[in-house]
Amino acid sequence: TRYTRSPYDPHRIETCSIQKGEWVMVNSKKASGIWVSDSSSKEEGSSQPKGDSLSRRKPSQDRSKERMEKILAAAEACILEMGAANLKISDIAAASGMANASVYQYFSNREEIIQALLERYLDYFYEQNTQLLGPVDSVEAFLIYLEDVVYGYHDYVKSNATYRAIWMDSQGWAELRAIDRKDNIRLAHAWVEKVMEFVPDLKADMAPNVFLTCIETGAHMTRVSVEIGGRVERIMMDEMIAMVRGHLSTFLRDH
């Protein structure tokens, strides 16, 4: 068994075993629980080495990068098994085959590891969204793009247990929400730049907030619908998309 990147999604790290050239996925488990910070209390016998925080910044040497990747892969596997709320540095160290002290050389606590994983997911979403945005050249094309983005995000949330666990177990964590909001603002500004190409008189002072509201509403409702599941899930998705599409259609066509 080893931790590696998916051959299908370069931004997703998976736990796999290779048998006769085949990839065998580890079964995902739905996570539940309440996020409890461990930044103030480390596990017994795993005291954090002293040192400047600069030593934990992204390493430049290939070997160090590989070890960081190994830690993140192990963390994702642990989250799949026990949820983000129960994640411990000692479990990550054991899963990666490294000592606790070695993990602390790269991350000062589990919160930093969770943040690193989330930032990877968000970078992946942003890259996919901006690629889809490239050929958009009209209001109608933008609204179709919007539907594709929302349904694509829904499928990702539904199929990626690790991403789902991070969000469902850590909604009370302000730092995580701040990272997400910063990424949403980044996407909103990308929308403004694109839409101004075919709506030159777009109200640039209003558009970022309008787009940001639509992005955050869509993301939140998507995650809630996945948690509810069943027939209600589809109803919520369809109604949310109709609402956001209608709001944006009115805003853009008023120019």
Question: In which residue ranges do the predicted regions lie?
Answer:
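Basic, helix-initiating cap at the start of DNA-binding domains
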Residues: 4-7, 13-82, 91, 95
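Helix-turn-helix
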Residues: 70, 78-112, 116
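Alpha-helical DNA-contacting segments of helix-turn-helix folds
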Residues: 114-121, 128, 183, 187
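Hydrophobic alpha-helical connector segments
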Residues: 116, 130-158, 214
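Secondary-structure edge/capping motif, primarily at the C-terminal ends of alpha-helices
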Residues: 129-137, 164-171, 222-229
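Short secondary-structure transition hinges
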Residues: 139-144, 159-189
